[in-house]
């Protein structure tokens, strides 16, 4: 099935870099080996994030074997890019690794620190990751592309936030408070904000197909709220959300002005 939980290990990393891949292909640039290694890096990041979250929720488990193993894999890949691309790429990828380590700590959604945690990880995985992908594959990222890539973070924040809430529900550790209530409203609607931003941004570059497809994409989070949220298990819902990011990656990849 399309929502089989194991698919998340492919879809989530794809959501980090698919826009960058499509943009590179549109510029007729593609470094196959670089992309394979970069994709493995994002797979390792996702595995590390999942492992760290479980360790944060269950502090009685041993952390060091997971920390050492995942970081050895990541640093081997960083060394590859240091040898083949540029130090600036290594520094950006290292920032993703660094922010990913915040998942070692249990951050409750009713705490102010959760806001910083979500924003930093969202920017790292959904902006920096795509930025690096474009740069590694094409060798150039224009200021126009850079600005447009940032819009995608809004969709990434939505998915990351809902995943956190689903994990809390699964673990029976739900948290409430004024910080959660205010921030929850904004992030839970960031998919809608992102679509509105798309309409406004491309007002002078009106594309009827883009408008139609972005409008249809609104059905995915709407169906999540009114139907799938009550029908699927937590793991299947997470896969559903990863599919949403892949869809949005395809739309942004093809309709970003380059």
Q: What kind of region is each of these model predictions?
A:
Residues 38-71, 151-198:
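Solvent-exposed interhelical
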Residues 63-138, 224-225:
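Intramembrane alpha-helical segments
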Residues 10-20, 66-76, 117-134, 179-193, ...:
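Small-residue-rich segments of transmembrane alpha-helices in multi-pass membrane proteins
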Residues 1-51, 100, 106-121:
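Topogenic membrane-insertion module of multi-pass membrane proteins
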Residues 15-21, 42-46, 68-80, 93-101, ...:
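Hydrophobic core of alpha-helical transmembrane segments in multi-pass integral membrane proteins
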Residues 13-38, 73-90, 127-149, 195-208, ...:
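Helix-coil boundary and interhelical linker segments in multi-pass alpha-helical membrane proteins
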Residues 47-57, 99-113, 159-171, 222-231:
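C-terminal ends of transmembrane helices
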Residues 56-61, 183-190, 200-258:
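Extended hydrophobic alpha-helices typical of membrane-associated regions
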């Amino acid at each position: 099935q399309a929502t089989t939980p194991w698919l998340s290990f492919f879809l989530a990393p794809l959501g980090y870099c698919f826009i960058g891949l499509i943009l590179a292909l549109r510029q007729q640039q593609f470094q196959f080996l670089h992309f394979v290694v970069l994709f493995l890096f994002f797979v390792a990041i996702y595995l590390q994030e999942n492992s760290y979250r479980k360790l944060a929720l269950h502090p009685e488990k041993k952390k060091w074997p997971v920390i050492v193993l995942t970081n050895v894999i990541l640093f081997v890949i960083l060394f590859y890019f240091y040898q083949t691309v540029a130090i600036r790429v290594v520094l950006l990828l290292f920032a993703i690794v660094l922010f990913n380590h915040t998942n070692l700590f249990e951050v409750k959604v009713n705490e102010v620190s959760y806001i910083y945690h979500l924003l930093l990880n969202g920017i790292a995985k959904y902006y920096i990751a795509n930025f690096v992908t474009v740069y590694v594959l094409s060798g150039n990222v224009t200021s126009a592309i850079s600005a447009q890539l940032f819009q995608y973070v809004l969709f990434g924040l939505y998915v990351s936030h809902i995943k956190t809430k689903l994990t809390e529900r699964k673990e029976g550790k739900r948290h409430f408070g004024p910080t959660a209530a205010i921030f929850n409203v904004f992030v839970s609607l960031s998919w809608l904000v992102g679509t509105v931003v798309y309409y406004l941004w491309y007002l002078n570059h009106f594309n009827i197909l883009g408008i139609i497809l972005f409008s249809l994409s609104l059905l995915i989070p709407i169906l999540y709220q009114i139907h799938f949220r009550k029908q699927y298990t937590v793991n299947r819902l997470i896969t559903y959300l990863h599919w949403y990011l892949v869809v949005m990656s395809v739309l942004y990849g093809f309709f970003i002005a380059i």
